[in-house]
């Protein structure tokens, strides 16, 4: 005799016998319950037996008998306390219900099988298709938000560069000691920037004593070729890129 596997085989045989006996008693109790409550020979169909509210809310195995028959314990509960304790100790499980494609899959299946069963269901196909559309739209919204953020960053950088150029021009003019230079308010803002600051500019360029402003004599000697070139800065009807080019050229000049 194999004493090593004797306990396992005996325990498995006991569990199988117990499970078969539970199924048989369960079927007999259900059959008897149907015969009592659904017999067409009585005029009190459905009103013959009364059940407690607690039994109506419990599982089917707990409400197999009426409340009045407390002596018939076999019909009241085919799974008695001893059998229930044996089932708990033996860790016996009733067979699971058949898998439905509309329910949750068993936990012992892999994720791939679960995904296949969910996607193969005709009811879930439209739901998953609409979910894919929603996900695509969310990705597109994120992409557009990133574009807007990048454009805002570019605009902020351009604004800071223009501000630095403006401050450099104003500081250079004030350092030359232009006593008669009047800081006139810009009649129009730069294109694309809602600013209305006081620039040392007019719509024809830099002016000094109603004449176009030119460089001092020390710069004229060094840049004789540029003496006759006008230093007017035209910013009317110019794009942001052109304004930056004009300001950059004035910065280098």
UniProtKB/Swiss-Prot annotation:
Q: What is this protein called?
A: Spindle pole component 29
Phosphoserine found at: 65
Q: Which of the residues bear the PTM Phosphothreonine? A: 18, 240
Q: Which family does it belong to?
A: Belongs to the SPC29 family.
Residue numbers spanned by region Disordered: 1-20, 31-123, 210-232
Post-translationally, this protein is described as follows, namely:
MPS1-mediated phosphorylation at Thr-240 is required for spindle pole body duplication.
Give me the stretches of Basic and acidic residues compositional bias: 69-91, 211-232
Query: Keywords on this record?
Result: Cytoplasm, Cytoskeleton, Nucleus, Phosphoprotein
Q: Does the record's keyword annotation contain Cytoplasm?
A: yes
- Set out the biological process GO terms recorded for this chain's protein: spindle pole body duplication
Query: Ribosomal protein as a keyword?
Result: no
What is the species of this protein? Saccharomyces cerevisiae (strain YJM789)
- Subunit text: Component of the SPC110 complex containing at least CMD1, SPC29, SPC42 and SCP110. Interacts with BBP1.
InterPro entries in the record:
Spc29 (IPR031392)
Q: Which domain of life is it from?
A: Eukaryota
**Subcellular locations according to the entry:** Nucleus; Cytoplasm, Cytoskeleton, Microtubule organizing center, Spindle pole body
Q: Which GO terms describe its cellular component?
A: central plaque of spindle pole body; cytoplasm; nucleus
Give the function comment from the record.
Component of the spindle pole body (SPB) required for the proper execution of spindle pole body (SPB) duplication. Links the central plaque component SPC42 to the inner plaque component SPC110.
Q: Which pairs of Cys residues are joined through disulfide bonds in the record?
A: none
User: What are the GO MF terms of this UniProt record?
Assistant: structural constituent of cytoskeleton
Biased composition, class Polar residues, residue ranges: 1-12
